[in-house]
Amino acid sequence: MSKVYELVSEYQPSGDQPTAIKQLLEGLDAGLAHQTLLGVTGSGKTFTLANVIAQAQRPAILLAPNKTLAAQLYGEMKSFFPNNAVEYFVSYYDYYQPEAYVPTTDTFIEKDASVNAHIEQMRLSATKALLERKDAIIVASVSAIYGLGDPESYLQMMLHLRRGDVIDQRDMLRRLAELQYSRNDVAFERGQFRVRGEVIDIFPAESDQDAVRVEMFDDEVDCISVFDPLTGVVKQRDLPRYTIYPKTHYVTPRDRILEAIESIKVELEVRKKQLLENNKLIEEQRISQRTQFDIEMMNELGFCSGIENYSRYLSGRSEGEPPPTLFDYLPHDGLLIIDESHVTVPQIGAMYKGDRSRKETLVEFGFRLPSALDNRPLKFEEFESLAPQTIFVSATPGNYELEKSAGEIADQVVRPTGLLDPILEVRPVATQVDDLLSEIRIRAAKEERVLVTTLTKRMAEDLTEYLHEHDVRVRYLHSDIDTVERVEIIRDLRLGEFDVLVGINLLREGLDMPEVSLVAILDADKEGFLRSERSLIQTIGRAARNIEGKAILYADNITKSMKKAMDETNRRREKQQAYNEKMGITPQALKRNIKDIMELGDITKSKRQRNTKQVPLSKVAEPSQTYEVMSPQQLEKEISRLEAAMYQHAQDLEFELAAEKRDEIEKLRAQFIANS
C-alpha cells in the first residue's frame, strides 16, 4: 500500500520518542480506545505524534485548548507534513456577543459578531480536505464540538461541473446563488462570482489562492480552468471536472427549508398555546412576532438572522439528538489527539452547561422556541460516544485521562537534547522577596531570565513595583492582556528588553522559553488551584528548557501537592540523568530562534510565495540612519508600506512579525515629526 502521509524532518526519533511511538502504534493496532502520552516539556511530543500519524497512515483531528496553541501546533504539523492536507479549524469569530436576555433589568441583548473571513476560509478548507482527501490532518480548538452544517446537506448542495455538461447559464448562476455565492462583476473576492459574456469566474469560498473559470459554448461547458484571481494567470487549463463547495457549512436545500418551515409552524402553535395557558401574554406575542418574521425571511431568502436556532429541523434531527459537528466529517478510521488534555478535557465538559443556561432564559421569556435548545455544543457524553480512538497528550494528565487509559501510558521523559528537569529547592517564606531579589541579580548578570508566580493580583502588582524600585527590569503579565500583547511580552522577555516576568498563573501553555533559567513560586505551600500538584509541575516545567534550569519553591511547610510535584520532578530528573550517562549524552542548550517563539504556521502559503522572501526579524526595515535622510513624503510612503505589511501579518496570525512592524512604524513616525 502506498503511503499517503509523508513525514519530512531532518531529525530521527531519539530519547524516549522511539519507545513512545512504538507503544502508541501497538495500542492503536490493538484497538485501544484511549491512550495517554505523558510527555515532559521539551521532549518533542509533537514530533512523536507526527511519527504516529505517519506510521499509522490515518487521518487525525488534533484538539488544542486555545487558538494560540492550535496555531503553533498547526505550524509544526505543516512543517512535518508539507505535502499533505494540514488544515486549521478554530472559531472564526474575532468578536462574539451571543443573544441573551437579563430578566432582572428586562434587557435583551441582540447577537453581535465579527467574522474573520480568513479563518472562515480555512474552516471550509478543512472540511473539504476531510471529504476529498485521504491525507487530512486537522488542527482544531474546542470549537470543533459546536454545531456545524449537516454533512449530507452540504454534500447535496455541491455544484459538480464537468467538461461537456449541458447546463443553461441562468441555471448555473441560480445554483451558485443557492450556494450563497454573490455576484460581483467589479470587485472579485472569495465567495463571489462574475459573468463576462459566456465566461463565468468563480472564487471558491474555501480557497485563498485559486479561482475557477468556466467557459461556455451556448449551453455547454466548453472549458474549465484554474487561475490566480490576483494576476489572472491561468495555472491549469482544460480540467475534466471541478466541484464548487457551498460558501458556508450551513447551506440547506430548498425542499429541506420548506419542510423545516412547516415543522417550525407546528411548534410555534404548540408553544403559543402553552404560554397563553400560563397567562404569559407578552411572551406569546413576542415568540409569535419573532418566529413569523424568521419564517418570512427563510421563505424569501432561504436564510434568516439566527437561522442556527432552527438547526434541529434544518438538519432533520430529532429532539435531543447531538448536533452535526466536525467529527461527522472525520472518516471512520480517524484518530483524535487531545493536546494539553488536562486543560482541554474539562473545557469540553463545560461548554454545554454554559450555553444551556443562557438559552433556557431566552426560551422561557419568549425570545426563542424550545427547539433552539438543540442548537448547542456536544454534551460530554456525546463527545465520548462520537470520539474515535483517542490519544491524550500532557505533561500532567488529569484523573479522567489516567482512568480512561487504564494504565496504557507512554512515558516520554527523556529529552533528545539531554536537558534535565530543573533542580528544586525549598526556601522559607519569611525572606522570600529579598532572597528572590538576590537570585534575580545573579540571573540578570548572566543575561538569563526569571519567571515569578504569585497567588494574588495584589501581590503580583506590589512585587512588580518593589522590584522596579530596586532597578530590576520587570514586567507584569495579568489577565487583562490579550493574546497579541501576551506574545509581544514573551518576545520582549526573550530579546532581553526586561529580565523578570511576574504573573499569577504562569503555567499557561506556550510560555516555554530557553532563556528562562529560574522559576520562583511564592507561597508554594498554600494549597489550592494554583498550587495543586499539576499546577506546580507545569510551573516548574517553565525552566526545563534551560541547561541551568532551577525552580525555587518558597514555603514553610511541604504540602501533599508539593511533595507529589517534587517527587515526580525528581523521578524524571533521575531517569533523564541515567539515560544520559548510559548513552554518553551531554545536555545541550536550546538555541531557538526568537522569531519562532510564537510562529503560528505558514497559514497563507500562497501569499508568502507571491511576496518577496521572508525578511529576518532583525531587518524588518531599513536601518534608522537611512530614515534620517528621507523626506517627509518618502517617510509617509514607507509608513504606509509597513502598515500594510503589519495588518497582513496580523491577519495571518503572525503576531510576532506584526509587532515588529508596529515598533518600526513608531520609530518612523517620530522621525517623520523630526524631519517635518
Curated annotation (Swiss-Prot):
UVR domain location:
636-671
Q: Where in the cell is it found?
A: Cytoplasm
Q: Which UniProt keywords apply?
A: ATP-binding, Cytoplasm, DNA damage, DNA excision, DNA repair, Excision nuclease, Nucleotide-binding, SOS response
User: Which SUPFAM superfamilies does this one have?
Assistant: C-terminal UvrC-binding domain of UvrB (SSF46600), P-loop containing nucleoside triphosphate hydrolases (SSF52540)
The alphabetized list of GO BP terms reads: nucleotide-excision repair; SOS response
GO MF terms, alphabetically ordered: ATP binding; ATP hydrolysis activity; DNA binding; excinuclease ABC activity
What are the binding positions for ATP in this chain? Answer: G39, V40, T41, G42, S43, G44, K45, T46
Q: Which coarse location class describes where this protein primarily resides?
A: cytoplasm
| Superkingdom of the source species | Bacteria
Which GO cellular component terms, listed alphabetically, does the Swiss-Prot or TrEMBL entry include?
cytoplasm; excinuclease repair complex
CDD domains under this entry?
DEXHc_UvrB (cd17916), SF2_C_UvrB (cd18790)
Q: Where on this chain is Beta-hairpin (motif)?
A: 92-115
Family annotation (InterPro entries): Helicase/UvrB_N, Helicase_ATP-bd, Helicase_C-like, P-loop_NTPase, UVR_dom, UVR_dom_sf, UvrB, UvrB_inter
PROSITE patterns from the UniProt entry:
HELICASE_ATP_BIND_1, HELICASE_CTER, UVR
Domain-level remarks: The beta-hairpin motif is involved in DNA binding.
Q: Which PANTHER family match?
A: UVRABC SYSTEM PROTEIN B (PTHR24029:SF0)
Role, per record: The UvrABC repair system catalyzes the recognition and processing of DNA lesions. A damage recognition complex composed of 2 UvrA and 2 UvrB subunits scans DNA for abnormalities. Upon binding of the UvrA(2)B(2) complex to a putative damaged site, the DNA wraps around one UvrB monomer. DNA wrap is dependent on ATP binding by UvrB and probably causes local melting of the DNA helix, facilitating insertion of UvrB beta-hairpin between the DNA strands. Then UvrB probes one DNA strand for the presence of a lesion.
Instruction: Output this protein's name.
Output: UvrABC system protein B
The taxonomic lineage of its organism, from the top, reads: Bacteria, Pseudomonadati, Pseudomonadota, Gammaproteobacteria, Vibrionales
Gene name, per UniProt, is: uvrB
